[in-house]
Amino acid sequence: MTLSAQQLQQHTPMMQQFLTIKSEVPDTLLFYRMGDFYELFFDDARKASQLLGISLTQRGKTGGNAIPMAGVPYHSVEGYLAKLIAMGESIAICEQIGDPATSKGPVERKLVRIITPGTVTDEALLNDRQDNLLCSVYQLQNSFGIASLDLGSGRFIINQFQHTETLQAELQRLNPAELLYPENFEHMDLIEHLQTIRRRPEWEFELATSKKILNQQFSTKDLIGFGVEKAEVALCAAGALLQYIKDTQRTSLPHLQSIQLEKNIDSVILDAATRKNLELTQNLSGGFDNTLAEVLDFTVTPMGSRLLKRWIHQPIRNFNTLTYRQTMIQTLIEQDLSSALADPLKQIGDVERVIARLALRSARPRDLTRLRTAFSLLPELQHLIADLPTELVGKLNKEMGLYPELLTLLEKAVIDNPPVIIRDGGVIKEGYNEELDQWRNLAKGATDYLEQLETRERQATGISTLKVGYNRVHGYYIETSRSQSDIVPAHYIRRQTLKNTERYIIAELKEHEDKVLSSRGKALALEKKLYEQLIDLLLPHLQNLQSTAQALAELDVLNNLAERAVTLNYVRPTLQAENGIEIEEGRHPVVEQVSKTPFIANPVMLNDKRRMLIITGPNMGGKSTYMRQVALMVLMAHIGSFIPAQQAKIGPVDRIFTRIGASDDLASGRSTFMVEMTETANILHNATKNSLVLMDEIGRGTSTFDGLSLAWACAEQLAKKIQAYTLFATHYFELTKLPENIPELVNVHLDAVEHGDAIAFLHAVQEGAANKSYGLQVAALAGVPKEVVSNAKNILRQLELGSQPQANLNEKPLQTTLAFDDAQTNQALLLLANINPDELTPKKALELIYLLKERA
């Protein structure tokens, strides 16, 4: 909303001020502080009224039309802000910074910050157990760069890659609360599903501009020291992100002290389909129930919970780091320290985000008490882990640190239970500052004086009901009933008339009022100044405090994984350099927790001689569960966790792929089969011999022969060319012949027992192929009408009889043509129809076979 000077003159001074500030943030809801309310005007008011369900009123007129207005009380604003942020809205906060008592004209106001979904740091507006990331994406030719910033911790990370599939996977992993993109971005289909995306001018992504703003932030000459200088596309994204942060926060960002380049080679790569199908932190319905994180996350600090979820979404390949985590978990179990460590960690809470608010100068009084609590508990934590081997806890102890001087400072400066905000004072402890104590004592002395004045005036006037009081609107007053107003002394000056009472002021009381209000104002101003100075004293320790928060979060995660290992009967997997995945009595970490019946543990053995398991068995027999549990155990091993098994040896794994289940992608116009084939293509293009691949029912979305052909060819490609560790579940029993031609393939099956029309699933993995799929029995269990099931049985018998002549599908399984074409089939059938088998001699029968062979 941009108005000319002439147009502004048509408004009141207050509205002129509003419109001038609003012109700075035309596309953002402006919360304009007026006394005890935040007001919104014009279109902002209409929008807020609709989104928040608050009343839409009017204030004055402009151009002959009433000005729409809506407002919320300042003391409950956070609840409204949280709702708007959850809807993806951005809010600009305009505060009164002038003193109404001394202001001539409108009180001075200033735009202090802009809150967007990706830049929130306020405790009340955040999910404390989930990262809140601002991301930026940029494309240059065939390369993509992505930058992510967690403003609540200062983690600033970039990555650069070349495929849209990787971009899709990264966006799903990061799950940004807000994403920035350049005006000419070509792949809108990959980002438009996100709730909050913001188009930014192309020039903000220029490399020179980006390097300049990044060097300014880190006070460096170049970025070589961070090891990011070659990731130029990612740096473009990072520069635009940092510019956006500076535009919205309008303050320095001292906790942004470095930038880190992530490399895919350091991680076990998970594509978007794999993250979704394995239900790591979100189930298929979008909730948290029955996910891996729900089972593993019993952390006691919010920052620990966030770190664990990052580990789950980004398993690592660094053997030394994984061994350290495993050994630390093992030691915590052996020393029985889990419960002892959990209690102080729980009291420490979320110091990571407290430190970020400290850096942004938005820390509240209770944030300082949380820091004080953390400082007081650090010695206890270090004492608890003092007996652990130095090679395990030496680095942790160093990063955790001790802060006796800061603890003493906060103990002297801040009262035990301060108010939520500093606005009304009452935060700084008595004895911390002599001048503050003097002003406070002067203000406190008012109570004694008022009691003495009331007693004296009652005696002087003879009015026994006379009272001396105070309110924020009218100040101090002497109150009498209206019936006694005719006997008040002449020097009483009427200040306010109420229904049954009269209120007066006298010169002595007015003098006292001026003195008290002056002392209160001076005390409050001094207290706010001391509070800012307190933050200034803490800021030089910012980098060390960030290291402390990271160390505490890691200790919480490792301690949590130790507790989970004991409680859930997990074992330490052996991570080996040799190829292979061998797990004895493995269990699905989630299903075993929610199942009402005992979970059936199963083994898996994959090595150079067993590269692929062809898995057959009944519907509902547990094939998908078995496959997922293998992937989840491998993933858990690569975050350093113990796993649900009796014993395990796991070799190098670079990627995990899953092709399990599919549904129509209506938004992109893709059918179930197209989704299935897209995921399959991704696997066939990107899997390596160290990848773990889960393929479930490939080819089921098309005709039988097409599906069988595709499944056959995919299995052959994975086994012979790619040689990935593969679990290949199928209902095409023809595929069970593949191991006869490819020795690295092995048949396994999940069995079931039939009794009459009933079926019992054993859920146990056995060597060899299954003999049937029990589809009709499962249909009956699902409640399909009996007459339909009965009819299906009859049809099945007919099909089985009719399919006998085509049982040669597996004779030449690796050839392109698996059966006669239509013309050849008709000729063969005609030839056979004209033959009487009883009249054939052995020689004629042999000649007939050769003839059919020639026409095949």
From Swiss-Prot:
Pfam families: MutS_I, MutS_II, MutS_III, MutS_IV, MutS_V
Lineage: superkingdom: Bacteria
InterPro entries cross-referenced by the UniProt entry: DNA_mismatch_repair_MutS, DNA_mismatch_repair_MutS-lik_N, DNA_mismatch_repair_MutS/MSH, DNA_mismatch_repair_MutS_C, DNA_mismatch_repair_MutS_clamp, DNA_mismatch_repair_MutS_core, DNA_mismatch_repair_MutS_N, DNA_mismatch_repair_MutS_sf
Name of the molecule in the record: DNA mismatch repair protein MutS
GO terms under cellular component: cytosol
Protein task: This protein is involved in the repair of mismatches in DNA. It is possible that it carries out the mismatch recognition step. This protein has a weak ATPase activity.
Binding site for ATP: 617-624
Keywords recorded for this protein, A-Z: ATP-binding, DNA damage, DNA repair, DNA-binding, Nucleotide-binding
Organism: Psychromonas ingrahamii (strain DSM 17664 / CCUG 51855 / 37)
BP GO annotations: mismatch repair
SUPFAM superfamilies: DNA repair protein MutS, domain I, DNA repair protein MutS, domain II, DNA repair protein MutS, domain III, P-loop containing nucleoside triphosphate hydrolases
GO molecular function (one): damaged DNA binding
Similarity annotation: Belongs to the DNA mismatch repair MutS family.
Keyword Glycoprotein among UniProt keywords: no
